[in-house]
């Protein structure tokens, strides 16, 4: 029995190991990988390996794995990577797993500087990457340093600014907090929506020469072929959409593209190696097929995938809403519980205050009772004294009357009678005055006793109100709350040094609608505002002496108001012949 071949496939976030038979084809291995990870949008992806000469190569699906130029190692190493890119991630990517794989691959390309990204965009993308990994920022959970082990922004950007690692993390943390409420899957999609507007996103670059021998770059992407000057990979100079191309072929190092416009000459360039032309042809055929497929009605399978994805997304939204509702309910219960505890404490304090007031009222009542008794005693003594004085007065009156009678009965001298009469009259006047004062005093004591009695009654009423008030309510009791492109070049060709492929453009709808696109920053005011704020912040710490060649080109494009899609419209102006003539003249 043939000995199995051990294979290790590395995706962007996992390592898979398989044992395959010597007669296993590339498609069988590919199908095993996508089945394992649950991927249905297989047309974007391929298996990449480093061949015997050290060049990165895509595994041919129609050939046996063992018959291809894979290195003889154990296990045989492959990378599962995106080979083709969508035009618009938001419109085309269906499954969450597809979004995640693109997100991780694009992020890796930006962090390694394979895709140029300006500083302010790099920081904003870094914050979306943090949201995609950690979810909502929580200051209790995400303590200082929680980003210390994360790759956040390209090293180039860090080197260009006078900011420490902590200062970079602080900036990203602030923007992380801005994304509160955004799902992790949504954060990945937002990342890709911004990243797809970067000039180098989704482009495969190849060194070529025109007939004059000028060194140039050929860029192959989802929208067509673009020509770049050797020192500028950001700004294409000439563009050809896939809908303008009817045939592509190569013979040895010569590559020929035949336009649909029969008045236009062939578009010819030269690659340094035959294997580069093979790769260019594969990418052209695959990207052209996807370009045409996107401009035709969806197949039943794609419609079903989209419907399933919508249902899954809807279900996730419902689950999210339920979680948010439950979270808010718990927060409400916690707030109510805290409020009840505060009210309980307030009631206890009020009860203590009532008790203290009661004790004071009882003490005051006791003092007032004692004072009332004292006043009553004083009144009684004053009454007795008034009665005694009244008795003395009456006695004096009687004596006076007796004297008067005696004066009538006896003959006394006028002087003696007058003297006695004057004496008793004076005494009577004194007694009258004393009696009047005592009556006033008695009246005063009676008034004070009445006031004391009124105070006593009032105090008793207050005490009765305190003692009969309903007790504070007891604290509440809480219950515990809880989806291929059919491979372009299946064979390297019936002829060993050449290959030709016809590219059909029939039946497509709105073949150049990509020229109407605008960047995410232009259509999204929030992203535009965030990028402007970040640009202003970073400009204060930027070391202008460390700007790279790409930085200078990007800044000049920005200064002239150019972006990826405005440049695309510009480089496709004129007819095909004019653009081919421009290419030949470069």
UniProtKB/Swiss-Prot annotation:
Primary subcellular site in the record, as a coarse category: membrane
Domain FERM: 2-295
Region feature Disordered, mapped onto this chain: 306-338, 534-565
Coiled-coil intervals, chain numbering: 302-462
Membrane topology: Peripheral membrane protein
Motif ([IL]-x-C-x-x-[DE] motif): 115-120
PROSITE patterns: FERM_1, FERM_2, FERM_3
Phosphotyrosine carried by residues: 146, 354, 478
Residue list for modification Phosphothreonine: 567
Keyword annotations from UniProtKB, A to Z: Acetylation, Cell membrane, Cell projection, Cell shape, Coiled coil, Cytoplasm, Cytoskeleton, Membrane, Phosphoprotein, S-nitrosylation
N6-acetyllysine sites (modified residues): 60
Tissue: Detected in eye lens fiber cells. Expressed in cerebrum and cerebellum (at protein level). Component of the microvilli of intestinal epithelial cells.
One term under GO cellular component: cell cortex
Subunit structure: Interacts with PALS1 and NHERF2. Found in a complex with EZR, PODXL and NHERF2. Interacts with MCC, PLEKHG6, PODXL, SCYL3/PACE1, NHERF1 and TMEM8B. Interacts (when phosphorylated) with FES/FPS. Interacts with dimeric S100P, the interaction may be activating through unmasking of F-actin binding sites. Identified in complexes that contain VIM, EZR, AHNAK, BFSP1, BFSP2, ANK2, PLEC, PRX and spectrin. Detected in a complex composed of at least EZR, AHNAK, PPL and PRX. Interacts with PDPN (via cytoplasmic domain); activates RHOA and promotes epithelial-mesenchymal transition.
Name used for this protein in its record: Ezrin
Underlying gene: Ezr
């Amino acid at each position: 029995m043939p000995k199995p071949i051990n294979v290790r496939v590395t995706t962007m976030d996992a390592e898979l190991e398989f044992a395959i038979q010597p007669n296993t084809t590339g498609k069988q291995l590919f199908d095993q990988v996508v089945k394992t990870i649950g991927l249905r949008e297989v047309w974007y992806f391929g298996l990449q390996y480093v061949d015997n000469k050290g060049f990165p190569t895509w595994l041919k699906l129609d050939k046996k794995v063992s018959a291809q130029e894979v290195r003889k190692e154990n296990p045989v190493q492959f990378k599962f990577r995106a080979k083709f890119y969508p035009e618009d991630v938001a419109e085309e990517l269906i499954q969450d797993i597809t979004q995640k794989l693109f997100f991780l691959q694009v992020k890796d390309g930006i962090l390694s500087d394979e895709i140029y990204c300006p500083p302010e965009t790099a920081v904003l993308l870094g914050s979306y990457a943090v949201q995609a990994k950690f979810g909502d920022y929580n200051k209790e959970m995400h303590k200082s340093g929680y980003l210390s082990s994360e790759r956040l922004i390209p090293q180039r950007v860090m080197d260009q600014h006078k900011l420490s690692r902590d200062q970079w993390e602080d900036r990203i943390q602030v923007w992380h907090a801005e994304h509160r409420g955004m799902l992790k899957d949504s954060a990945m999609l937002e990342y890709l929506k911004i990243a797809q507007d970067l000039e180098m996103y989704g482009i495969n670059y190849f060194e070529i020469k025109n007939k004059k021998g000028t060194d140039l770059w050929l860029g192959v992407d989802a929208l067509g072929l673009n020509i770049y000057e050797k020192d500028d990979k950001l700004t294409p100079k000439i563009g050809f959409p896939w809908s303008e191309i009817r045939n592509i072929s190569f013979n040895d190092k010569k590559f020929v593209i035949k336009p649909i416009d029969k008045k236009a000459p062939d578009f010819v360039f030269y690659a340094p190696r035959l294997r580069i032309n093979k790769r260019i042809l594969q990418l052209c055929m695959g990207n052209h097929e996807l370009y045409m497929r996107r401009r035709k009605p969806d197949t039943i399978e794609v419609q079903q995938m989209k419907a399933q994805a919508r249902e899954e997304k809807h279900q996730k939204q419902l689950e999210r809403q339920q979680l948010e509702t439950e979270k808010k309910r718990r927060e409400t219960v916690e707030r109510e519980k805290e409020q009840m505890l505060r009210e309980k404490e307030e009631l206890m304090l009020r009860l203590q205050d009532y008790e203290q007031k009661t004790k004071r009222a009882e003490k005051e009542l006791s003092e007032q009772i004692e004072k009332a008794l004292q006043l009553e005693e004083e009144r009684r003594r004053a009454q007795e004294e008034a009665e005694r004085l009244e008795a003395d007065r009456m006695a004096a009156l009687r004596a006076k009357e007796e004297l008067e009678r005696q004066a009538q009965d006896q003959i006394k001298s006028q002087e003696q009678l007058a003297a006695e009469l004057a004496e008793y009259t004076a005494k009577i006047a004194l007694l009258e005055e004393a009696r009047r004062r005592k009556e006033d005093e008695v009246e005063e004591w009676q008034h004070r006793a009445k006031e004391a009695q009124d105070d006593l009654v009032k105090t008793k009423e207050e005490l009765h109100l305190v003692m009969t008030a309903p007790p504070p309510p007891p604290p509440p009791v809480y219950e515990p709350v809880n989806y291929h492109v059919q491979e372009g070049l299946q064979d390297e060709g019936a002829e060993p040094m050449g290959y030709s492929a016809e590219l059909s453009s029939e039946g497509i709808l709105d073949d150049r609608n990509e020229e109407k696109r605008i960047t995410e920053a232009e259509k999204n005011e929030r992203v535009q505002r965030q990028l402007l704020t970040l640009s202003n912040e970073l400009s204060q710490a930027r070391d202008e002496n460390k700007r790279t060649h790409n930085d200078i080109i990007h800044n000049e494009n920005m200064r002239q108001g150019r972006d990826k899609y405005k440049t695309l419209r510009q480089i496709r102006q004129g007819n095909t012949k004019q653009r081919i003539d421009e290419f030949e003249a470069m």
